[in-house]
């Protein structure tokens, strides 16, 4: 398929022939070769073992009898140096069973994939692993030639990998020989002209000789400049590549992703650079027959997304100048092959800002997959987490190996961060950061191995911004005595919230009942920058208030304040039982214990529903000095608080609002009367509430 039209050769006085970009992971080609499937079948089958059933323990023994109770899954090691780290990237993937199955199918069938999930769950790792297991295509080089019919539309040719360099070298050698011949003829003519001028018997013969030599030199120098354009440019060089390419176009501008044509400041006077030499390949051309990975796909501008759609649909894309002010905007090559597998990634908001047609292309020619945040806690998975620690140590290269107790503490932290019973977190990037901080501490302390104490210290030093903010907030509350100094208060309840997903904070809620301002009905006024979900939770609480109260609520206004909620406001429904308790306390004038905090969602029938982040909320209550905390019964097994807090706080699981009031309110005669009245109205006895359990429902994100 090579273009052998080399009728003219360029002169050798233009040494600045631009070199093509070849120091990237480029694999480009034009045509599918069915013969490749025979050699590639075995490699695609390797995807069956994509991070699953890997011998993470190498030659180390496993105590199967104690595997269930051991945080190492029965692994018997002296330190992480005993654990064999797989050489292949695919074998280092942990969890994400559904995503691995999708990746396997996409690699076999050449399908696009969109991965949506939280940061640090392995999206880029899976994409890179997929590229290394793609079938080996017949790699090709891409050449760009001058178009004699239209210099602004360079021709594109493909040749087998390695042939591109040979063709360019052959063109350059021919140009060099032709240049030598032109130089030889030029000097012969200059000598003849000078000799003839000197033979003429006139006073001006020296000047005539000089002018003759200069004229001949300029004639040879600036004529036949078109021969320069006959040397093609090697746009993509795959001479040394043996595997499919992986191109990361995350955050790339239009020129870097789609290809570009450089601006030529000298466009006339014989100084112009041929248009084909100014063509530069983009990520989509370099990713031909490989994987194009784009993280945060929604951050691409609409114009780039539209052109990406065209490339996906057609499998080829012309390169043109991306800046309308550049001379390259007038150049447009023939179509360059870009038959890639696109792996798009992003968080949940990616789908909102993503071009609908681009998402439709991916769905029409591929798969969508949601990345898991957690995975079931099993002995085998714990052993893989131990291998993960060994991988991080080997990858960093400057960390001391981890002792077994340090690995156990890291696995325990993975359980805590999961926020669910019998689960481990799959946000391994954050966990890897903790591994590196612990290793740095161990090295600074002069430890041969990273110990459990180093991991505990790392947890303190590697706190998130939200955790540091919460600690400062608690200290400010103490400094300015923002917390109540009494043991009980009417209409005031200590609620609990989560910031940033891994930091709990105590958020007091106050309620007050006043005569209605409107003559038609009583209203609920909630302040604290409540968001939509929190506002709906307040409305649901009002149903319970109206149901049990003897008061005519149409004649009263209910004021609810989330004290010092901050600029971020309040979202989620986990403060439902807090709001209900505060309003009931204010309405009935019954005080609430102030050494108590609570969290939980609430149904309109009074059932307490599960919420998220319960571990972080309990720890926040303990830090704030609370002695007791109320949580939903359904979250009881999700609690994974640190050892230092277990003796500081009592955890009280509940299933119904009547249980909440029985624990939170003080003043026996008034409280008992209120609770009994609530039981009779709701038809739910306190004694039978624990047997009936919860009514279900999904955990709140807050």
Curated annotation (Swiss-Prot):
<dbReference type="GO" id="GO:0006508">
    <property type="term" value="P:proteolysis"/>
</dbReference>
<feature type="topological domain" description="Extracellular">
    <location>
        <begin position="202"/>
        <end position="206"/>
    </location>
</feature>
<dbReference type="InterPro" id="IPR020568">
    <property type="entry name" value="Ribosomal_Su5_D2-typ_SF"/>
</dbReference>
<dbReference type="InterPro" id="IPR000523">
    <property type="entry name" value="Mg_chelatse_chII-like_cat_dom"/>
</dbReference>
<dbReference type="Pfam" id="PF00158">
    <property type="entry name" value="Sigma54_activat"/>
</dbReference>
<comment type="subunit">
    <text>Homohexamer. Organized in a ring with a central cavity.</text>
</comment>
<keyword id="KW-0472">Membrane</keyword>
<dbReference type="GO" id="GO:0005886">
    <property type="term" value="C:plasma membrane"/>
</dbReference>
<feature type="active site">
    <location>
        <position position="574"/>
    </location>
</feature>
<dbReference type="InterPro" id="IPR003593">
    <property type="entry name" value="AAA+_ATPase"/>
</dbReference>
<dbReference type="InterPro" id="IPR014721">
    <property type="entry name" value="Ribsml_uS5_D2-typ_fold_subgr"/>
</dbReference>
<feature type="region of interest" description="Disordered">
    <location>
        <begin position="1"/>
        <end position="63"/>
    </location>
</feature>
<keyword id="KW-0645">Protease</keyword>
<feature type="binding site">
    <location>
        <begin position="117"/>
        <end position="124"/>
    </location>
    <ligand>
        <name>ATP</name>
    </ligand>
</feature>
<keyword id="KW-1133">Transmembrane helix</keyword>
<dbReference type="InterPro" id="IPR027417">
    <property type="entry name" value="P-loop_NTPase"/>
</dbReference>
<dbReference type="GO" id="GO:0004252">
    <property type="term" value="F:serine-type endopeptidase activity"/>
</dbReference>
<feature type="transmembrane region" description="Helical">
    <location>
        <begin position="184"/>
        <end position="201"/>
    </location>
</feature>
<feature type="active site">
    <location>
        <position position="617"/>
    </location>
</feature>
<dbReference type="GO" id="GO:0004176">
    <property type="term" value="F:ATP-dependent peptidase activity"/>
</dbReference>
<feature type="domain" description="Lon proteolytic">
    <location>
        <begin position="487"/>
        <end position="667"/>
    </location>
</feature>
<dbReference type="InterPro" id="IPR008269">
    <property type="entry name" value="Lon_proteolytic"/>
</dbReference>
<dbReference type="InterPro" id="IPR008268">
    <property type="entry name" value="Peptidase_S16_AS"/>
</dbReference>
<dbReference type="InterPro" id="IPR027065">
    <property type="entry name" value="Lon_Prtase"/>
</dbReference>
<feature type="topological domain" description="Cytoplasmic">
    <location>
        <begin position="224"/>
        <end position="702"/>
    </location>
</feature>
<dbReference type="InterPro" id="IPR046843">
    <property type="entry name" value="LonB_AAA-LID"/>
</dbReference>
<keyword id="KW-0812">Transmembrane</keyword>
<dbReference type="InterPro" id="IPR004663">
    <property type="entry name" value="Lon_arc"/>
</dbReference>
<dbReference type="GO" id="GO:0016887">
    <property type="term" value="F:ATP hydrolysis activity"/>
</dbReference>
<comment type="function">
    <text>ATP-dependent serine protease that mediates the selective degradation of mutant and abnormal proteins as well as certain short-lived regulatory proteins. Degrades polypeptides processively.</text>
</comment>
<keyword id="KW-0720">Serine protease</keyword>
<dbReference type="Pfam" id="PF05362">
    <property type="entry name" value="Lon_C"/>
</dbReference>
<keyword id="KW-1003">Cell membrane</keyword>
<dbReference type="GO" id="GO:0030163">
    <property type="term" value="P:protein catabolic process"/>
</dbReference>
<dbReference type="GO" id="GO:0006355">
    <property type="term" value="P:regulation of DNA-templated transcription"/>
</dbReference>
<keyword id="KW-0067">ATP-binding</keyword>
<feature type="topological domain" description="Cytoplasmic">
    <location>
        <begin position="1"/>
        <end position="183"/>
    </location>
</feature>
<keyword id="KW-0547">Nucleotide-binding</keyword>
<feature type="compositionally biased region" description="Acidic residues">
    <location>
        <begin position="10"/>
        <end position="48"/>
    </location>
</feature>
<dbReference type="InterPro" id="IPR002078">
    <property type="entry name" value="Sigma_54_int"/>
</dbReference>
<keyword id="KW-0378">Hydrolase</keyword>
<dbReference type="Pfam" id="PF01078">
    <property type="entry name" value="Mg_chelatase"/>
</dbReference>
């Amino acid at each position: 398929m090579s273009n052998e039209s080399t009728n003219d050769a360029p002169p050798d006085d233009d040494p600045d022939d631009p070199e093509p970009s070849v120091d990237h992971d480029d694999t480009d080609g034009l045509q599918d070769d069915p013969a490749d499937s025979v050699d590639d079948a075995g490699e695609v089958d390797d995807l069956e073992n994509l991070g699953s059933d890997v011998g993470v323990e190498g030659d180390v023994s496993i105590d199967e009898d104690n595997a269930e109770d051991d945080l190492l899954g029965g692994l018997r090691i002296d330190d992480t140096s005993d654990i064999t780290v797989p050489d292949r990237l695919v074998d280092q993937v942990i969890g994400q069973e559904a995503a691995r199955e999708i990746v396997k199918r996409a690699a076999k069938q050449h399908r696009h994939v969109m991965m949506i999930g939280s940061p640090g769950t392995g999206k880029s790792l899976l994409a890179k692993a997929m590229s290394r297991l793609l079938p080996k295509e017949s790699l090709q080089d891409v050449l760009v030639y001058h178009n004699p019919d239209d210099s602004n539309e360079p021709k594109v040719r493909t040749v087998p990998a390695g042939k591109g360099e040979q063709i360019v070298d052959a063109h350059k050698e021919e140009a060099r020989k032709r240049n030598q011949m032109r130089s030889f003829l030029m000097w012969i003519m200059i000598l003849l002209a000078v000799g003839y001028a000197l033979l003429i018997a006139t006073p001006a013969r020296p000047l005539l000789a000089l002018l003759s030599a200069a004229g001949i030199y300029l004639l040879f120098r600036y004529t036949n400049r078109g021969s320069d354009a006959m040397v093609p440019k090697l746009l993509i060089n795959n001479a040394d590549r043996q595997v499919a390419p992986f191109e990361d176009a995350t955050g790339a501008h239009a020129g870097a992703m789609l290809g570009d044509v450089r601006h030529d400041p000298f466009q006339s006077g014989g100084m112009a650079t041929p248009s084909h030499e100014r063509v530069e390949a983009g990520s989509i051309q370099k990713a031909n027959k490989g994987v194009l990975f784009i993280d945060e796909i929604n951050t691409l501008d609409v114009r780039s997304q539209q052109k990406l759609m065209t490339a996906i649909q057609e499998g080829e894309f012309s390169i043109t100048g991306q800046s309308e002010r550049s001379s390259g905007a007038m150049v447009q090559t023939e179509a360059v092959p870009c038959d890639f597998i696109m792996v798009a990634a992003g968080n949940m908001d990616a789908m909102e800002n993503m071009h609908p047609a681009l998402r439709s292309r991916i769905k029409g020619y591929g798969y969508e997959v949601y990345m898991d945040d957690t995975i079931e806690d099993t002995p085998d998975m714990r052993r893989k987490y131990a291998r993960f620690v060994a991988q991080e140590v080997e990858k960093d290269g400057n960390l001391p190996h981890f002792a077994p107790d340090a690995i156990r503490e890291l696995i325990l932290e993975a359980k805590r961060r999961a926020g669910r019973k019998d689960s481990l977190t799959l946000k391994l990037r954050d966990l890897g950061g903790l591994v590196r901080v612990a290793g740095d501490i161990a090295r600074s302390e002069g430890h041969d191995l990273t110990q459990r104490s180093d991991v505990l210290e790392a947890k303190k030093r590697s706190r998130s911004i939200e955790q540091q903010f919460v600690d400062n907030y608690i200290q400010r509350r103490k400094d300015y005595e923002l917390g109540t100094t009494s043991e009980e208060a009417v209409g005031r309840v200590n609620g609990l919230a989560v910031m940033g997903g891994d930091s709990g904070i105590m958020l007091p809620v106050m309620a007050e009942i006043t005569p209605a301002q409107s003559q038609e009905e009583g209203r609920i006024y909630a302040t604290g920058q409540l968001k939509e979900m929190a506002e709906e939770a307040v409305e649901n609480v009002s149903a319970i208030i109206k149901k049990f109260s003897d008061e005519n609520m149409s004649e009263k206004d209910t004021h609810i304040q989330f004290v010092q909620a901050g600029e971020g406001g309040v979202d989620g429904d986990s403060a439902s039982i807090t709001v209900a308790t505060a309003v009931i306390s204010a309405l009935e004038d019954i005080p609430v214990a102030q050494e108590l905090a609570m969290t939980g969602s609430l149904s309109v029938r009074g059932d307490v529903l599960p919420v998220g982040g319960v571990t972080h909320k309990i720890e926040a209550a303990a830090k704030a000095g609370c002695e007791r905390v109320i949580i939903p019964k359904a979250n009881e097994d999700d609690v994974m608080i640190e050892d230092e807090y277990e003796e500081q706080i009592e955890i009280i699981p509940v299933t119904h609002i009547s249980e909440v009031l029985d624990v939170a309110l003080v003043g026996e005669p008034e409280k008992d009367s209120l609770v009994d009245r609530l039981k009779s109205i709701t038809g739910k006895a306190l004694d039978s509430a624990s047997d009936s359990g919860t009514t279900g429902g999904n955990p709140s994100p807050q």
